Amino acid sequence: PSYGYRLSTSYTQMFEIGGQGKGNAELIWAIPVNTEAVSWNDWHMFVLPTDFADHGMTSGYECVNSTWYFYDSFEVNDVRKTYLVTSYKAQDGSIINRENPGLHLELGPIPLKYGYDINVTGNGGKSNIDPIIYRLADVYLTLAEALYLKPASSETDKEEAISYINTIRNRANLDEINSKDITTEE
């Protein structure tokens, strides 16, 4: 039973302002935030470089980074790369990117995860985008792993597991996989 949950048609929209709340049937658990009250999302503050000045947002602490190895592990059309920011405008007007990484993109892209929020100014970082803890896609992938790796897993179990994985891949506009594509338990 789905209990009223269903995958969002847009992967990225649920990580943007207005993409959370009761209107998003994929979200099982998100922490509601409100910068006018006493709760907010600090993620932008932790990931934005100190010289960031793009999409109406400015600077952060840059405590968390990603790697180019991780970024390159995604398929070319994978929508999940959307908020792995590979280029941005710096406060001095220069463009920082993989070819011109400066200090901030030398290791890898910015793991923004959540969309742009013009309320994030300076290293105060108070965003109104609700942090997502658990969503239906997580349930599908957890169930797929359990079915595929359970002791004495049957071919029917593995086919069901792959169908759950492909449901997520289809939403991400990726090609479907089959059992030959799963070669390790990792």
Regions found by a protein language model. Give the residues of each.
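Short, cationic low-complexity segments
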Residues: 48-68
